[in-house]
Design a protein with these regions (language model features):
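Acyl-donor-binding surface of acyltransferase catalytic domains
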Residues: 1-8, 76, 86-156, 296-297
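A short beta-loop-alpha structural element at the N-terminal edge
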Residues: 9-27, 151-177
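Helix-loop element at the rim of GNAT/NAT acetyltransferase active sites that forms part
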Residues: 27-42, 166-182, 200-201
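Conserved acetyl-CoA-binding loop-helix of GNAT-fold acetyltransferases
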Residues: 89-102, 238, 244-261, 280-284
Length: 304
């Protein structure tokens, strides 16, 4: 399927990605993004080839005169994976217009888009409005002395129920809930926490993950995985009534020390822009922003 759309000249087209062009596609994707967990072409290519045929068909190439100049992934009312070869930056608006046109033709009303903030001016010019953004932060690992007066131990998989209740309570009223993160039913939460142990967010690293205990009560937890080539802090939370006492810092430093012992030089995490307490903690430990912000934006339905 090829669609000319209502935007731009006939020389620029959106086409479903052909597997034979996957290498060129992901090379273009990497060239236009700085907010990614890795720039390793093979990792991205292997992840794509591991998708189901239906998932692969959601990837589209923006092609000009037969050359791939942009990438995007289209859902029924969603745009993601948006990237433009920097040498074709003037075509960004045309590619986006064609994507919106294609989704509108398919019946989409409101459209949600995910992209790096370098593309935000173009999205905003077409009516997309930022909902929230997240940024990737990284820090070098280092060994530190274990905290005094705080019991840390690796969580066990049979603690999923206890950890689930802990995370539900810790995230109640959190800034991210207004954006649809860290919400859901008890079953959804159990599935999410259990999925971290099972590898849904990368290989779970039990020896770099900890719970902080006061007696039998969990007052803090950090869960670390190995995702896209680097250790990732998948979750870090502290009980509401125990915040400001250094528990989050102790958990993070314990994990970083264990990773250093595993010869992992760096660790990454993602934080929502505006979550200043978390961001300030991470910066004080040595984390710095890497790449641009990953933005989630929304285009309301026509006539709204």
């Amino acid at each position: 399927m090829t669609r000319q759309g209502l935007a731009g000249g006939v020389s620029l087209q959106l086409e479903p990605l052909q597997t034979t062009e996957a290498h060129a596609y992901w090379r273009v994707f990497l060239s236009g993004r700085t907010d990614l967990p890795t720039g390793d072409l093979k990792i991205h290519l292997d992840r794509y080839l591991g998708l189901t045929p239906e998932e692969q068909r959601s990837h589209f190439s923006a092609k000009k005169e037969g050359r791939i100049i942009g990438t995007l992934r289209l859902g029924p009312s969603e745009i993601s994976g948006f990237s433009i070869d920097p040498s074709f930056a003037p075509e960004t608006a045309t590619v986006l217009l064609k994507a919106v046109d294609l989704l509108r033709a398919g019946g989409a009303t409101a459209i949600v888009a995910h992209f790096e903030d370098r593309y935000e001016p173009v999205f905003a010019s077409l009516g997309f409005r930022r909902v929230f953004a997240r940024m990737r932060m990284e820090a070098p690992t280092r060994k530190v002395a274990p905290p005094k007066g705080l019991t840390l131990q690796p969580p066990e998989e049979d603690e999923v129920l206890g950890l689930t209740k802990f995370f539900v309570d810790a995230y109640e009223g959190h800034i991210e809930q207004q954006y649809g993160m860290h919400t859901g039913s008890d079953d959804e939460w159990r599935g999410y926490v259990g999925g971290l142990f099972k590898g849904d967010s990368g290989q779970y690293l039990p020896d770099a993950s900890y719970v902080a205990l006061e007696g039998d009560r969990i007052v803090g937890a950090i869960l670390v995985t190995h995702w896209m080539g680097m250790p990732l802090v998948a979750e870090l939370a502290v009980a509401k009534d125990r915040r400001g006492r250094g528990i989050g810092r102790a958990l993070m430093e314990a994990a970083m020390g264990r990773l250093a012992g595993r010869d992992e030089p760096r660790v990454a995490l993602y934080v929502t822009v505006g979550n200043d307490p978390a961001t300030n903690l991470y910066r004080s430990i040595g984390f710095t922003q890497v790449g641009g912000q990953s933005v989630t934006s929304r285009l309301e339905s026509q006539g709204t």
